Amino acid sequence: STWVAVSFVGGSSGTWSYNISGWTNGRRYRVSARAKDAAENQEAYAPGPIFTIVMSTPLAAITQPTNNSGWVYFPALQGTANDGSGDLVVSSQSGIVYSTHVQTAIQRQDNGKCWNDGAWIDSPCHPRWIDAPFVGYSSGVWTYGNVPSGINLDSGVRYLVLARARDTARPYLPGNLQDSFDVGTSSNIFYVDIDSASAAITFPYDLTQRNSLVITSGTIADTFSGVLNAVLRISTGTSYWNGAGWLAPAVSTEVFAQAASTGSFSSTWSYVNLPSNWGASGAVVKIDVRGRDVTANTQNTALSVQWLYDNQAPAAQVGTPGADGAFYSPAVPLNN
């Protein structure tokens, strides 16, 4: 260590200061001071306090919701945070510690309004930072649960969520502040969609008769998150089709037909894994369909068609002439 002269203001007492540059991040330093009077009397050496220079930026990351994800409700916000010390020894980490040292901000992407921990406030307002309780020291987890719900939650809206952290490095408490928000880490956009897709059956036609069916198909549409699949229930009144066989009527089951263009607003679907045996001739087959979107919203009310399974060939008989070898005038019709 080296003793250097410092600036002193006063007479028999006063204050001193010394400006230093070139600090090294994570390094521990000791500062000691001693005084000398005009008579050359010098204070005995006494070790001063040890401190650590922390210039690394803390980081808060969002683990829920993930970027570009879809939800049927507004999820509680969750994430991690660390003080950015990296490989520095524990004793040199300033830590985050306080619950007020992780914050989050929520903004609607349709009208720019910001969440104010209980209500939406008008734009311009972003970012409106809200404290998110943090558990840990130099690293840990944070949560924020007072998210929009009820009348404050609209379907078909995209939301931006930010997170930031502060450490406890002195003298500027609460210390170093995160000022970078990488997409997918500290800045995520997600959407809430509570409205289901809708599906319809275009084949087979309702109230028709068939001796077989090798494909059923239809359309599916969704207004926001996009279509996923059609949910089918195929039954005969005595059993349900599960994709591999018929189940007893007490076991209602469904099969799924993937949309031809997953994620689009409008598409088609088809299902070919149908039974080769539809049971006894005369059975009435019912096909119900419901639409499902990529957020897993499923249509509440199914649309249905019914068709009659008939594999019995018709029979015809000749009544006139009644026997082989007879002779008839052309004026006499042949009939049964």
Predicted regions and their residues:
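Low-complexity, disordered linker/stalk regions enriched in Pro/Thr/Ser/Gly
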Residues: 1-336
